[in-house]
């Protein structure tokens, strides 16, 4: 928790302070859907209560609070984009920020089974990295934002971990679950309205391409 606090909370504060001092027009903050935590209300809307289940989720949410404060107090334009489960090229396959698709492919390449936490029925709103990049560009340019708005960046549908594993291979094993939300799903109507954003990534067609590029589908 201490390392996360230094990197996420203090790091964000430093960026906002430097941007304000340097006269930067706008900061687009990479927020996280982990702010929602475990919720029975889906899809998640930006006005929903926050309930982070981890230090990371809590600190990313506090970054949103700081962005809003810098807009109101110091006049720095800010907008916070809550990312939902990003996948795409060059994704991490190990470490704290590794995503499940990359982990599964890496495990199979090593001759290991895909490790599924719990029963695999937990669902995630997988969002293509190219769509996230486009959202950031639009957020930096849109005249409709800049006052500390919080905006979901998610595909707007979700898949179970079992579904993802089945797309990749059939060698899998179930291991002990971890504490995590059973499901995430974004309401992305605010992004469409304020940014003119529309997700275009298709995980069904992307995973086969990724497997081939990684040398798994031979």
Predicted regions and their residues:
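N-terminal Rossmann-like NAD(P)+-binding domain of SDR-like oxidoreductases, especially those catalyzing
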Residues: 1-84, 130-133, 197, 213
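Residue-level signal for the nucleotide or nucleotide-sugar donor/cofactor binding architecture
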Residues: 7-10, 47, 54, 95-99, ...
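Glycine/proline-rich active-site loop of Rossmann-fold NAD(P)-dependent oxidoreductases
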Residues: 61, 86-102, 110-112, 116-117, ...
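Hydrophobic alpha-helix immediately C-terminal to the catalytic Tyr-X-X-X-Lys motif of short-chain
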Residues: 62, 66, 70, 100, ...
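Protein kinase-like catalytic domain
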Residues: 71, 109, 140-141, 214
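C-terminal "lid/loop" region of Rossmann-like NAD(P)-dependent oxidoreductases
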Residues: 119, 149-151, 159-188
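Non-catalytic, hydrophobic alpha-helical segments
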Residues: 132, 136, 153, 164, ...
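Amphipathic terminal alpha-helices
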Residues: 189, 203-218
